Design a protein with these regions (language model features):
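Glycine-rich, acidic loop regions that bind phosphate or pyrophosphate groups
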Residues: 1-69
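Short glycine-rich anion-binding loops that position phosphate/pyrophosphate groups of nucleotides
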Residues: 2-6, 116-118, 169, 195-196
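Active-site glycine- and acidic-residue-rich loops that bind
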Residues: 4, 90-95, 170-173
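A short acidic, amphipathic alpha-helical/loop segment
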Residues: 9-13, 100, 177-180
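Thiamine diphosphate
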Residues: 16, 32-43, 47-53, 121-216
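Generic enzyme active-site microenvironment
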Residues: 24, 112, 165-166
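Active-site diphosphate/adenylate-binding microenvironment
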Residues: 73-154
Length: 216
C-alpha cells in the first residue's frame, strides 16, 4: 500500500519475493509496475480503494505464516541485535551508543537523525516516551538533514531536550549550521557517529555492485 519497492525495502530486485502474488495500491500511477510487476495493480486513493478491496476477501488467521516470522525475529536477535548491543570484538558499536543515549535521556528527548547507517540503528534502538519525538528524513533520504532539523525541533519544542544523531558524512553537508546555532543560541546536542565512510552507500555497493566502491 503506497510503497515504491525501492532497494531499501526489496534488496536485489531479481530475487525479491518471486513466489508472491503482489497487490499494489498507489495513488500515483507512475509508481505501479515501475520497479516490481504487480499481480493486481490498484490505482487510486487507498482511503477509498483499500476498504473496497478488503470487502472482497475473507478474513484469514495466517497462524503458520506469522509463526515463521516469530522464528525470524529470534534469529535477528541472535545474529544482529545481540552482536550490536553486546559485541565480542571490544570495539564500540553504534547500537551501544544509542543504548547509552537512552540511559541518559530516559526516552524523554526528541531524537533527530540524519541519513545513513546511524539512522537505521537509531530508529531500531532509540526509546521514546512521547509521540512526535523521532524526526528523520525517511522518504527522501536527505543527507545533512539532522542539524537544521534539530534547530527547528528546538524552536518548536523549546521545553524539550533535542539530540541530533549524525554520521560523519552527513555532518559535513550542513556543518555551517553550527553558525546558526551559535548566533541564535540554540541548545541542541549533537552525537556524531563516525564510521569512516558514507557507510550505507558503501554497504549497497558491497551488496549489489560487486564491491565497486565509488565516492564513499
Amino acid at each position: 500500500v503506497g510503497m515504491r519497492f525501492d532497494d531499501r525495502v526489496t534488496g536485489r530486485l531479481d530475487k525479491y519475493a518471486k513466489q508472491a502474488k503482489l497487490i499494489h495500491l498507489d495513488i500515483d500511477p507512475a509508481e505501479i509496475d515501475k520497479n516490481v510487476k504487480s499481480t493486481v495493480p490498484v490505482w487510486g486513493d487507498c482511503k477509498e480503494t483499500l476498504p473496497m478491496l478488503t470487502a472482497l476477501v475473507d478474513e484469514k488467521k495466517h497462524t503458520d505464516w506469522l509463526n515463521t516470522f516469530y522464528g525470524y525475529s529470534k534469529q535477528e536477535k541472535e545474529i544482529v541485535i545481540d552482536q550490536e548491543l553486546h559485541p565480542a570484538s571490544g570495539e564500540i558499536t553504534m547500537g551501544e551508543v544509542v543504548e547509552a543515549l537512552n540511559e541518559l535521556t530516559n526516552g524523554n528527548a526528541i531524537i533527530v537523525t540524519d541519513v545513513g547507517q546511524h539512522q537505521m540503528v537509531a530508529c531500531r534502538y532509540a526509546k521514546f516516551n512521547e509521540s512526535k519525538s523521532n524526526i528523520t528524513s525517511g522518504g527522501l533520504g536527505t543527507m545533512g538533514f539532522a542539524l537544521p532539523a534539530a534547530i527547528g525541533a528546538k524552536f518548536g519544542a523549546p521545553h524539550r531536550e533535542v539530540v541530533a544523531i549524525i554520521g560523519d558524512g552527513g555532518f559535513q553537508m550542513t556543518l555551517q549550521e553550527l553558525g546558526t546555532i551559535m548566533q541564535a543560541q540554540v541548545a541542541v546536542k549533537m552525537l556524531i557517529l563516525n564510521n569512516r565512510f558514507l557507510g550505507m552507500v558503501r554497504q549497497w555497493q558491497q551488496l549489489f555492485h560487486d564491491k565497486r566502491y565509488s565516492f564513499v
